[in-house]
């Protein structure tokens, strides 16, 4: 029931025109997910477009000098994200012809990729089942299941991961993942949530 409500909402109201939703592949998803860490979509959009214009493939990113990569990141903040992108691009290009692994554990061995980013690459990039738990999803799940407690608390976080795993479907994976993030970003907002629009 939860998944159906989320997917029905997405078909009607979800965001489907973001640049990383076009020509989908693990590389494009990975860059977008790293840029979106701690950063709003509206801020990321121009950076993503410029970054992809200069580095349309992981091989192009790997071959670029680090200072050029950092110039493309200038203004986005959290600069270790850009350094990790470059390191991972070089590693994958050197060791696997630029091909991403599609298993969570293997993805998490790469610089700057945690459990949620790995889940996003798997679900959005490969369209394979991979739960995610970013800030938006935490908010949706904690309100839906009435989970109290600080997200940084390990018990609270474990409970949220339990529900993230439980609710992630085996079909329509890419759509569900995008949908639950969208609901958290546009409806179940931190401040002034639009509860009347909640599916």
Residue ranges and their predicted role:
Residues 2-196:
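Catalytic cores of DNA base-excision repair glycosylases
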Residues 199:
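Cys/His-coordinated zinc-binding microdomains
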């Amino acid at each position: 029931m939860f998944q159906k409500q989320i997917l029905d909402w997405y078909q009607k109201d979800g965001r489907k025109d973001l640049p990383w939703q076009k020509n989908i592949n693990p590389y494009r998803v990975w860059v977008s997910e790293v840029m979106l860490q701690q950063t709003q979509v509206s801020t990321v959009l121009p950076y993503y477009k410029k970054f992809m214009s200069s580095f349309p493939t992981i091989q192009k990113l790997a071959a670029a000098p680090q200072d050029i990569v950092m110039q493309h990141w200038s203004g986005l903040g959290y600069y270790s994200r850009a350094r990790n992108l470059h390191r991972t691009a070089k590693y994958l290009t050197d060791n696997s012809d630029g091909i991403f692994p599609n298993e969570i554990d293997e993805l998490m061995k790469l610089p700057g990729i945690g459990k949620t980013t790995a889940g996003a690459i798997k679900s959005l990039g490969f369209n394979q089942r991979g739960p995610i738990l970013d800030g938006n999803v935490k908010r949706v799940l904690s309100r839906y299941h009435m989970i109290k407690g600080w997200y940084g608390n390990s018990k609270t976080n474990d409970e949220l991961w339990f529900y993230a795993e439980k609710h992630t479907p085996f079909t329509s994976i890419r759509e569900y993942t995008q949908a639950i993030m969208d609901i958290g970003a546009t409806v179940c907002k931190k401040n002034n949530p639009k509860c009347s629009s909640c599916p």
